[in-house]
Amino acid sequence: MRKKIEYPASDLLIQPLAPDDDLSSFSCGVNSLDDFFQKEVVFCHKHSYLTAYVVKSKKDKCIIGVFALSNDVISLEEDDVEDIKDKIDDEYKFMLSRQLSFPAVNISHLAVSSDYQGRGIGRMIVLYVIVLVKRLRFSGVQFITVDSMNNPRTNKFYLDLNFSNRSIDDFGAETRRMFLNVMDFE
């Protein structure tokens, strides 16, 4: 059964990173993410390595979240393909059985300001990405991928949003490769 995409109306604005967006003091409390957003994301966005977005309060235009998207491909094992076949239209199943690599959008970085964590903003961002790839159809996308920071809180966050671990091989690594089948959503 497909899940309906719902996120609450809010006082937040999501828009592409603009030249006047100042991320120099943005902090989510994770040094590697803070460094990326403060020092690298503008360059990566400018040169189309990724597309960065900011989440702002409509009231005071304060940046409370940042995320970046890039194109990706996910290769699935035959067992994984079998698991998703029942969610595929019959007319497309023959194609599914002939391929093991699928187009995806990668949430390459996602962070919420330390002052705003625990308020559902990260969840809203992921739901926004699902809507973006599912409804706008800006390119062929069947999956959303993420390399989740490998800690219990972050892994639980993505698992609660129906992401699956790609494998158990990265269990002890710094990040865990996870994916979400966008065909699970209306």
Stretch-by-stretch model annotation:
Residues 3-43, 47, 52-54, 62:
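Short amphipathic alpha-helix that is part of the acyltransferase structural core
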Residues 48-68, 81-84:
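Conserved beta-hairpin
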Residues 50-54, 66, 104, 109, ...:
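Short hydrophobic/aromatic beta-strand element in the GNAT-like acyltransferase core
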Residues 68-109:
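Conserved acyl-donor/pantetheine-binding loop and adjacent beta-alpha core of acyl/acetyltransferases
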Residues 113-115:
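Active-site acidic-Proline motif in GNAT/NAT acetyltransferases
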Residues 118-132:
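Conserved acetyl-CoA-binding loop-helix of GNAT-fold acetyltransferases
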Residues 126, 133-147:
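Conserved GNAT acetyl-CoA-binding A-motif
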Residues 148-168:
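Conserved active-site alpha-helix within GNAT-family acetyltransferase domains
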